[in-house]
Amino acid sequence: MTAEKALPLGNGKAAEEARESEAPGGGCSSGGAAPARHPRVKRDKAVHERGHWNNKVEFVLSVAGEIIGLGNVWRFPYLCYKNGGGAFLIPYVVFFICCGIPVFFLETALGQFTSEGGITCWRKVCPLFEGIGYATQVIEAHLNVYYIIILAWAIFYLSNCFTTELPWATCGHEWNTENCVEFQKLNVSNYSHVSLQNATSPVMEFWEHRVLAISDGIEHIGNLRWELALCLLAAWTICYFCIWKGTKSTGKVVYVTATFPYIMLLILLIRGVTLPGASEGIKFYLYPDLSRLSDPQVWVDAGTQIFFSYAICLGCLTALGSYNNYNNNCYRDCIMLCCLNSGTSFVAGFAIFSVLGFMAYEQGVPIAEVAESGPGLAFIAYPKAVTMMPLSPLWATLFFMMLIFLGLDSQFVCVESLVTAVVDMYPKVFRRGYRRELLILALSVISYFLGLVMLTEGGMYIFQLFDSYAASGMCLLFVAIFECICIGWVYGSNRFYDNIEDMIGYRPPSLIKWCWMIMTPGICAGIFIFFLIKYKPLKYNNIYTYPAWGYGIGWLMALSSMLCIPLWICITVWKTEGTLPEKLQKLTTPSTDLKMRGKLGVSPRMVTVNDCDAKLKSDGTIAAITEKETHF
């Protein structure tokens, strides 16, 4: 991969250098000689090029790997069943059109236009809202610490699958209690009503006693689970080597990590729909209950699922888009990827609920008693269903391999985008030698040690705090509101449409522009307010209540990202010289080196005779594209 050298066009000194380069062999000579090199290029000879994707497939697979993750398998199907089956698709499609696609496209196009990571892209389009970039990276830093814990659990389960009998299929192990009952072998006449009430399944005891060794509460952190610590180390090692060479390594790894889960999902789908009772499970999954649409919580669940599953407001899409060629048709890519993501979620529901229907059929209980979401589905419900199948170790192996690959590319793309943001802020520091690789190593080591606290006996309580507060839907909605305000009103939706037209050759439908300006921020603000009004303190398993300081930690993690935006606005306005209108004028003016490089603009990579003639003003300076379209 190579990246072309750039000669930015601007006023003042930049214009002088451009005119001085018109010597023989310069960029604007009439002889058609090679373009001039910017003097800085020679001084920074040791600075590595930023790089690009080798081809479109690498970009598409990287984005697909990031957005298609565990939430598609363990969250969407359960939400669909819980919120009216097929009726849930109505609010889901509304949010898909009004929030999912517009914000997804906004972030991807912004990265492609600026060729910058998740922080510097906002600095270039509107310095006043650079805090958006910091907010996204704080959320991403939280995700990098806790999301990979799920991979550690999955690796531990996978390591226990290579046996003739799965260890969570039977009682009698050292971690089982006297209340352990194998329900598939249950003879009700041998148990009293009281003993059945206290009975627990071997799969539940394996999860709570063997894997988590869970304590009584967050107050009792307990000992480190060293086996899980080794699994976490393995996960971080794999993650590091997937991204240590940037797009050169990531672009190759995603050919496997983004496609393999589809093979596993197809196999599990075929197996699931052929099981007895599968049809009942699918019916519960899709049977429409239109009366549920009157419940506001159904609409909130649909909106938050869109934000969770599309990886928006994390800076990932901006970072991945920044490695695209300038003229890549990012609009077409975004529409295709959004449809692929939602389609995968829908199909995954058949694979999951067919198996849950089978489990309910085998146990003779309603599906409502076996349906789970989140870790409960991945590590309790589905493993329990697998024990009822012939060749159960094989199906368990395939399932946990699918989980690992689904989570792995989501994890390393998150780390890659955080690294991209840092490197783009300090390119002369980190694009030399092996400094970028050392930065990735440092972030991985720090995140690993921070994650160890979630692998203690009380670690599950901390994990739930991260999941419910640090990367909650409330934080994502808050960031989305400001993203839309910045692009739709401050930078200007029409100007951004000009930038997009310059990149892809045409203007997308006006609906997306109106979503940026009105619909998306309005909907997000409504859901955000609903979150605050209906807020209920987190309870683990709906039983354990956290101490006050536990909720305090959760809210600190949530506010650590959301406060970045208003704090940055206040600090920059205070530090900028001039009157308030002058300050706002400066802070809402895009960077002078932010240029359109296609047919509507001038390429900063190569300056030709025609370009120089077209852009030179009467006073000899080169025109800068800094006209404002602020809707204040």
UniProtKB/Swiss-Prot annotation:
Widespread distribution in the brain. GO terms for biological process: amino acid transport; gamma-aminobutyric acid reuptake; monocarboxylic acid transport; response to xenobiotic stimulus; sodium ion transmembrane transport. InterPro entries: Na/ntran_symport, Na/ntran_symport_GABA_GAT3, SNS_sf. Residues 1-41 are annotated as: Disordered. One of its GO terms (cellular component) is cell projection. The chain crosses the membrane at residues 59-79, 87-106, 131-151, 226-244, 253-270, 306-323, 335-356, 389-408, 438-456, 473-493, 514-533, 553-571. GO terms for molecular function: amino acid binding; gamma-aminobutyric acid:sodium:chloride symporter activity; monocarboxylic acid transmembrane transporter activity; taurine:sodium symporter activity. Pfam families: SNF. Residues 152-225 are extracellular. It is a multi-pass membrane protein. Glycans are attached at N187, N190, N198. Disulfide bonds: none annotated. Keywords: Cell membrane, Glycoprotein, Membrane, Neurotransmitter transport, Phosphoprotein, Symport, Transmembrane, Transmembrane helix, Transport. It is found in: Cell membrane. GABA transport is inhibited by SNAP-5114. The modification Phosphoserine is found at S21. It catalyses: 4-aminobutanoate(out) + chloride(out) + 2 Na(+)(out) = 4-aminobutanoate(in) + chloride(in) + 2 Na(+)(in); taurine(out) + chloride(out) + 2 Na(+)(out) = taurine(in) + chloride(in) + 2 Na(+)(in); beta-alanine(out) + chloride(out) + 2 Na(+)(out) = beta-alanine(in) + chloride(in) + 2 Na(+)(in); hypotaurine(out) + chloride(out) + 2 Na(+)(out) = hypotaurine(in) + chloride(in) + 2 Na(+)(in). Residues 1-58, 572-632 are cytoplasmic. Mediates sodium- and chloride-dependent transport of gamma-aminobutyric acid (GABA). Can also mediate transport of beta-alanine and to a lower extent that of taurine and hypotaurine. Belongs to the sodium:neurotransmitter symporter (SNF) (TC 2.A.22) family. SLC6A11 subfamily. This is Sodium- and chloride-dependent GABA transporter 3. The gene is SLC6A11.
